[in-house]
């Protein structure tokens, strides 16, 4: 990504839900797009629901690594609101660890512009 960062330090469980910023067990390497476009909307849905209702949410984020790749291919995000049996929040989504215009080697983490040698 010319002049910009491709990779972010990604919280598996978003900061707005944990208040933790540097827990190594909650961090993976992800693309800027996965972090700010892919994951953030789901994290915010849960955070807003909790703030508005004070209800509990079962929430799990699982990074998916293929074979011995160093970089996750994405994360599975699952959420279920407890007190209302999922009528407030209920989703199970997969967010891909991609960046538009960039080709990523998930085994090594190396990247290049699509179409470049």
Features from the language model and the residues they span:
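Domain-level detector of nuclease and nuclease-like folds
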Residues: 1-117
């Amino acid at each position: 990504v010319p002049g910009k960062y491709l990779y972010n330090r990604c919280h598996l469980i978003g900061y707005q839900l944990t208040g933790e910023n540097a827990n190594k067990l909650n961090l993976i390497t992800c693309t800027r797009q996965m972090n700010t476009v892919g994951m953030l909307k789901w994290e915010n849905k849960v955070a807003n629901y909790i703030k508005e209702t004070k209800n509990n949410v079962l929430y799990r984020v699982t990074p998916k690594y293929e074979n011995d790749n160093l970089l996750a291919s994405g994360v599975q995000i699952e959420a279920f609101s407890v007190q209302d049996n999922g009528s407030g929040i209920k989703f199970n989504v997969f967010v891909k660890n991609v960046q538009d215009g960039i080709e990523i080697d998930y085994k090594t983490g190396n990247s290049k512009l699509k179409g470049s040698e």
